[in-house]
Every structure is written in structure tokens, then in C-alpha cells.
Regions:
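Non-heme di-metal
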Residues: 1-230
Length: 230
């Protein structure tokens, strides 16, 4: 956690903007559409990451995945909760659908994919340089570091987003239960990272995944910031 806190992602201007800037309805829609795009991709990557974990490490991921998908109740999926925040803020369904995903957010998605799922046949196709860098590292440990970075940053993201949506009197919307949920998930992800650090001494691999996602988050935050600065 201390390692991650020292990274520039934690002090990205996005967080100040979310806490202080006036956000229009259109900006709120663009912001949430882009957050939706990144979160939807990460949910799928979590499922992939679970498939390369040792049996004894899978449990650290399952609760997170199940919660994201509404604990088995389709209407409680987190994606639907996010979209309801947008609609409750006054964004029309037509406008929400029409908003584009920022180039920087697409760069984030492309960058984090091999960190969550760093198997040879994937990285050889999509990230050959990554394959060379990680040839001697535990692929599951890289994914563990990536997941840990995501969950640590998610806590900060939701705290700032909750403040931003006070402007729409939506700070108590169920989607912002994520502030507590992500605190719990960050504990699970840190436990996952510690599993590889203590049982497999995979420090270099965990750090590679952790740092890689933190670096990628700069692209994500650049894209999200652009949506509220237009």
C-alpha cells in the first residue's frame, strides 16, 4: 500500500477536479460512460485472471467478481448501478449511448490487459515487448499485482466520485456503497499479493503488475479528466 501511495497516480489532477469543479449534466454523462468502459473491461479481466491462479489463490478474487455481478442478482449488477447514477443526474439514455470513449481510456484498456492475463499466447500477440520483459516472472503473480493496484486506486476513485456527485444530490446512491466495498476488496487484493510474496517470493512479478497498472491509470485518469474539462 505504501509503495502504491508514492506513485503519481494518487496525485493525478483528476482527483482535485472531482472534488472541486462544477460538473455539468453532459460532463457527468461522459465521465460515467468512460468509467463504465474501463470498469466493464476490468470485470472481464478479473474472470480471466482467476483462471491462471493457483487453486489456493482463486478465493481472493471470487468475492470481488461475484459482488461486481450483483451477487447473482442481475438487476444489482454494478454496471446498472453506475448507469442509474448517470440517468438520475439527468443524462438521457440516448445521450449516454452516444458518448464516446476517450482515446486515453482506450490506451488504459489496451495496457492493462496483458497485466491481468499475461499468458504467453496472449502477450505474444498483443504485447511482444511485455512478453520479453516477463519471460522469467510468475504470470499469476503479475496478475495479483495488477489486481492489487486496481483495488487500491478504486478506493480513491470512488471517494472522489462521491464528492463530485453531491452536486446532483446523489452522494447516497447505492453505487457509492463502493467506497466501503472497495475498501474490503483492497484488503482481499493485498492478501492476494501477500500470498505470492510470502509463499512464492514473487516480489519482482507482483511489483511489475502493480507498477504497470499504476502507470496505466495515468492514461485512465487523463481520459476521465478530459470528460469534465470539455
Amino acid at each position: 500500500r505504501n509503495f502504491a501511495n508514492q506513485h503519481g497516480a494518487f496525485s493525478h489532477p483528476l482527483f482535485t477536479a472531482l472534488r472541486t469543479d462544477k460538473i455539468t449534466v453532459a460532463s457527468a454523462g461522459r465521465l460515467l460512460k468512460n468509467y463504465d468502459a474501463h470498469a466493464s473491461h476490468l470485470r472481464r479481466l478479473l474472470l480471466k485472471a482467476a483462471t491462471i491462479m493457483p487453486e489456493s489463490a482463486v478465493g481472493f478474487i471470487l468475492e470481488n467478481v461475484r459482488n461486481e455481478y450483483g451477487n447473482g442478482i442481475d438487476s444489482e449488477r454494478h454496471q446498472l448501478q453506475l448507469q442509474d447514477v448517470a440517468f438520475s443526474a439527468g443524462v438521457s439514455r440516448e445521450d449516454y449511448k452516444s458518448y464516446s470513449v476517450e482515446k486515453s481510456v482506450k490506451t488504459f484498456i489496451k495496457t492493462v490487459t496483458p497485466l491481468y492475463f499475461p499468458i504467453e499466447q496472449h502477450t505474444a500477440k498483443h504485447a511482444p515487448q511485455f512478453k520479453k520483459q516477463t519471460s522469467a516472472l510468475s504470470k499469476a503473480a503479475i496478475a495479483a499485482g495488477a489486481i492489487t493496484a486496481t483495488e487500491l486506486m478504486a478506493v480513491e476513485e470512488f471517494k472522489a466520485l462521491q464528492i463530485a456527485f453531491r452536486q446532483f444530490d446523489l452522494q447516497d446512491h447505492i453505487w457509492f456503497d463502493h467506497v466501503q466495498v472497495e475498501e474490503e476488496h483492497s484488503g482481499d487484493s493485498i492478501a492476494l499479493a501477500l500470498y505470492f510474496l510470502t509463499r512464492h517470493q514473487s516480489f519482482e512479478a507482483v511489483e511489475f503488475g502493480l507498477r504497470g497498472v499504476l502507470d496505466a491509470n495515468i492514461h485512465l485518469y487523463d481520459g476521465l479528466l478530459a470528460t469534465i474539462k470539455l
